[in-house]
Amino acid sequence: MSDTNHSTLKVSDFSFELPDELIARYPQEQRSASRLLSVKANENSIEHKHFKNIVDEINAGDLLVFNDTRVIPARLLGEKVSGGKVEVLVERLLDDHRVLAHVRANRAPKAGAELLLEGHVKITMLARHDALFELKFEHDETVLELLEQYGHMPLPPYIDRPDESSDKERYQTVYNREPGAVAAPTAGLHFDDEILQQLRDKGVNSAYVTLHVGAGTFQPVRVEDINDHVMHSEYAKVSAETCNAIKQTKASGGRVIAVGTTSVRSLESAAQASTNESIEPFFDDTNIFIYPGYEFKVVDSMITNFHLPESTLIMLVSAFVGRDLIMKAYNEAIKERYRFFSYGDAMLLQR
C-alpha cells in the first residue's frame, strides 16, 4: 500500500470536507435500509451496495462479534440548589448510587454542592477527578432506574437536535443487554431481527463482547502528531465463551468479523493482554489506540459506520485497509451522497 510513512502521520492526514447535509440527523425508517460501501484492500476496490447485501458477503462458518452494550439515557438537565443551570452527562456507573459524570455549568460545582435535575433527581457532588465529577444520587432507586425514568438519550453533538422518544429505541441495537454506554456502538444499528435470522440460517455464528462506549469517543484529537495522543479509557469485557468461539473459527478457516470499532478495540485489547499467541478473556479498562502501523491480531474483517474527520476511529479503519484507500472511499461516499456518522450508512472493510 502506498501509505504515508507511519511515523510521520499527522492528524491533518485524516481530514476531509463533509457537506453538512450529509450528516444523518435521523435514522432510516428501517434499520437495514442503509447503504453499504464495500472496501476490499486486497483488491484495492470500492463497491456500492445495500446493507441487506451483508448476508451475501458473510460465509457459513464466519463469526460475527457484536458489542452488546446498552445505551443509558445518561443526560440530565437542571440546576444547582445554590443557583445556576447545570447539565450532567453520566460517563460511568460506579455502583447503584454513584457515578462519574461530565458536568457543564457556568461555575463547576464544588464538593458538597447539591444539584436538582429534571425537577426530581437529587444529587450531591462528592469529588472531582480531572475532567470528571463523582456524583451521588440521593434516592432509594438505583441510578439506572432514575435515568430510565428521567434521563435523555445522549445523542452525539453533531446530531444537533433534542432527543425524541423514538431515539430510545433507534439509538440502540436490537441485541443490547448490558446497560452502561453513553454512545451507541453504531455499526450494530443496521442489524434487524430479520437479517440476524438470515445470517443464522446461513450458518454464520455470533459472539458478544461488552464495551461501554464513553463520551470520550467524540473527543477530538488535540495534538498534531498522532503518536502524542492519549486515548480515553473504557471498560471492556471479552468472555471465555467468546475467546473459544474465536479460536474455533480461526481453526476451521472462518473469518472473525467485528461489528463496529468498539468490538475491534475489545478483541484487540484482549489479544494484546494475552500471555500467549492467542486471545484470552479480558475484563478491564482499555485505552488501546489503533492507527496505521498497528498489526491486527484477531480481526479479519469489520463492519463500521463513517467516522468524523481527524478522529481516532478514522485512524483505526485506516490502520485496517490503508489510509489512501479509506480516504478514497470517503471521498467517493461524499460524491455518492452517503449518510454519515451515527445514524448514517455502513462500510464493510475486508483485506
Swiss-Prot record:
Do you know which InterPro entries this protein is assigned to? QueA, QueA_dom1, QueA_dom2, QueA_sf
Q: What does the record give under GO molecular function?
A: S-adenosylmethionine:tRNA ribosyltransferase-isomerase activity
Q: Does the keyword Transferase apply?
A: yes
Catalyzed reactions: 7-aminomethyl-7-carbaguanosine(34) in tRNA + S-adenosyl-L-methionine = epoxyqueuosine(34) in tRNA + adenine + L-methionine + 2 H(+)
SUPFAM superfamilies reported in the protein's UniProt record? QueA-like (SSF111337)
The organism's superkingdom is given as Bacteria
Q: Where in the cell is it found?
A: Cytoplasm
Annotated pathway? tRNA modification; tRNA-queuosine biosynthesis
Name any GO cellular component annotation: cytoplasm
UniProt entry keywords in alphabetical sequence? Cytoplasm, Queuosine biosynthesis, S-adenosyl-L-methionine, Transferase
Which principal EC class is assigned to this enzyme?
A: transferase
User: Per the UniProt entry, what is one GO biological process?
Assistant: tRNA wobble guanine modification
Q: What is its EC number?
A: 2.4.99.17
- The primary site where this protein sits is cytoplasm
Kindly state the subunit structure of this protein. Answer: Monomer.
What is its biological role? Transfers and isomerizes the ribose moiety from AdoMet to the 7-aminomethyl group of 7-deazaguanine (preQ1-tRNA) to give epoxyqueuosine (oQ-tRNA).
Q: Which family does it belong to?
A: Belongs to the QueA family.
**Could you tell me what this protein is called?**
S-adenosylmethionine:tRNA ribosyltransferase-isomerase
